[in-house]
Curated annotation (Swiss-Prot):
Subunit structure: Monomer. Interacts with TMED10; the interaction mediates the translocation from the cytoplasm into the ERGIC (endoplasmic reticulum-Golgi intermediate compartment) and thereby secretion. Interacts with IL1R1. Interacts with S100A13; this interaction is the first step in the export of IL1A, followed by direct translocation of this complex across the plasma membrane.
GO cellular component, one term: nucleus
Listed InterPro entries: IL-1_alpha, IL-1_CS, IL-1_fam, IL-1_propep, IL1/FGF
Annotated source species: Lama glama (Llama)
Description of post-translational modifications: Acetylated within its nuclear localization sequence, which impacts subcellular localization.
Pfam families xref list: IL1 (PF00340), IL1_propep (PF02394)
Family: Belongs to the IL-1 family.
Official protein name in the record: Interleukin-1 alpha
Propeptide: 1-112
Gene Ontology MF terms: copper ion binding; cytokine activity; interleukin-1 receptor binding
Domain of life: Eukaryota
């Protein structure tokens, strides 16, 4: 079975030494376009024979071979048509090789399994408090209070709003978000509302101080959205979930009805 790295090593050896093949490849930036036209002398006949011997039937679908050089596409007359630089030292299959030959767009191959947190490393920087000691009322005019254990939040109809939880809303900013991320901290404490999975109660997480930069603790952040007279708090960590209330249920995370995600902010 033909070894793909050996093929490209043979192709590279066919260049004359004065063409500075290696230095051109080494100085490419991964941020630059990955395809470009280049003119070279025709390859020797024996090199073309080796190229023509490669076919998809000779390349394993599951072979875990890695390229440390750029992938090269060569025409029948020996002219280099395309070079592609890989964005990471990734495993290559013949599906990737076929994509290189057929792809008309100029792009860098990205690994299929790169986690989101590796692709987008967002930092949120603290700005200021935008609401002091505000009260959150849901669409049924129930106010947010602490449950009897003090560990969770719940909604209840109150005759005296002094019993409602007062929140300080801290605004953050980042280079990648056009929305306004905020934290909800219980006033005069270091307890921050922390989003959980769908239908799970939100937690009150104690922090030593107001975070100046939030990078990993995105459960503490919510995109504050306003539609008409209603306010919504969408989780940054779980973008499809909102802070919500429901009859006989603790304040939790939900995507919508039957839970209530509409709130009004009452300022003191």
């Amino acid at each position: 079975m033909a070894k793909v790295p050996d093929l490209f090593e043979d192709l590279k050896n066919c260049y004359s030494e004065n063409e500075e093949y290696g230095s051109e490849i080494d100085h490419l930036s991964l941020n630059q376009k990955s395809f470009y036209d280049a003119s070279h002398e025709p390859l020797h006949e024996d090199c073309m024979d080796k190229l023509m011997s490669l076919s998809t039937s000779e390349t394993s679908k599951t072979s875990k071979l890695t390229f440390k050089e750029s992938v090269v596409m060569v025409a029948s007359n020996g002219k280099i048509l395309k070079k592609r630089r890989l964005s990471l030292n990734q495993f290559i299959t013949d599906d990737d090789l076929e994509a290189i030959a057929n792809d008309t767009e100029e792009e860098i191959i990205k690994p299929r399994s790169v986690p989101y947190n590796l692709q987008s490393n967002v930092k949120y920087n603290y700005m200021r408090i935008v609401n002091h000691q505000c009260i959150l009322n849901d669409a049924l005019n129930r106010s947010i209070i602490r449950d009897p254990s003090g560990q969770y939040l719940m909604a209840a109809v109150l005759n005296n709003l002094d019993n409602a939880v007062k929140f300080d809303m801290g605004a953050y900013t980042s280079e990648e978000d056009s929305q306004l991320p905020v934290t909800l901290r219980i006033s005069k404490t270091q307890l921050f509302v922390s989003a959980q999975n769908e239908d799970e109660p939100v937690l009150l997480k104690e922090m030593p101080e107001t975070p100046k930069i939030i990078k990993d603790e995105t459960n503490l952040l919510f995109f504050w959205e306003k539609h008409g007279s209603m306010d919504y708090f969408k989780s940054v960590a779980h973008p499809k979930l909102f802070i919500a209330t429901k009859q006989e249920k603790l304040v939790h995370m939900a995507s919508g009805p039957p839970s209530i995600t509409d709130f009004q902010i009452l300022e003191k």
